[in-house]
Amino acid sequence: MLKLSRLLSAIGLLLVSHSVGIAAELVSGSYTITQSWSQEQDFERSYFVHVPESAEPLPLFIFLHGNGGNAEKSMAGFTKRNQELSKRYNMVFAQGYQKSWNIVSERSQAPDREFIEAIVTELSGYTNVQATDAVLMGSSNGAALVNQVAIETKLDHFSHYITVVSQLNAWQHDGTAFKAKGGDNNYTESVVPLKGKCLMNVSGANDQLVPYAGGPSKGIRAKDGKLAFVDAERSTFLWAQHYGYTGEPLTQPTESSDVMDTFSYLDGAVIHYKMNTRAHNAGGGVTEPMLLEFLNQSNPR
């Protein structure tokens, strides 16, 4: 009778476990999020994950490729170049619809902020994922989406944002306020981004596609002609100001060399690197030590 009772109890536990689901570990591989919008219905959007060996849960590091990019190829290259970083984070590489991210007038009209938020929410449920201190990094068009996520998201999972060769554009900040994209991509609603974050921007002094000094791009279209940008140093100051800096904009770098000028606010919690000899290839000047140093920063404000 005792054996039968134990057997029934075991069966009951199995049934309960099956009904509520057993917490699982995230593993390396490809995953999808299903979304519908004007261009697609029930469309499976891909992202790729690299999970390092770790005895403790690790935070997420999400990378967004530039226009025309490929997430799987980005993962191979980025993890090879940044091996120490790839041991400290669960690395995620999301694929943009039509190799694009929906900013102003790009090919993609997809709900991309919601896509990134869905990835974070989904992966945070795994036992080997730390739900806090997530990092969102993007290059060019991907960096523009990083800015938009930083502007609009209400998810508090992110602690660090990294934007490479795309400071704020003039639709995202009109000189007075940060702007939500809106369903029609008209950027008319003023919003207040979450505070207490860290932000790193890297821009090329000779960039013509995303002009360092601001103004219209020579190649990126917008609804009213060419996409205009905020001055890169001004853009960094606007973020620093929002995140708690109360002083005047820096007019001189805090560190300088022939290769790179550094503008540091809030003890490095908000930092801008001006690559003096580079253009839209400024991301090539970003080293793993630079990333690791920034990711060790915190913003208590």
Question: Can you describe what each PLM-predicted range is?
Answer:
Residues 106-127:
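Alpha/beta-hydrolase active-site loop
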Residues 55-101, 169-173:
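Short substrate-entry loop that stabilizes the transition state in hydrolases
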Residues 67, 97, 205-208, 213-216, ...:
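Acidic beta-to-alpha connecting loop that harbors the catalytic carboxylate
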Residues 9-18:
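Bacterial N-terminal signal peptides
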Residues 159-160, 166-248, 264-265:
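The feature captures the conserved acid-bearing segment of alpha/beta-hydrolase catalytic domains
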Residues 215-301:
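C-terminal catalytic-base region of ester-bond hydrolases, centering on the histidine
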Residues 1-9:
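Bacterial N-terminal signal peptides that target proteins for export
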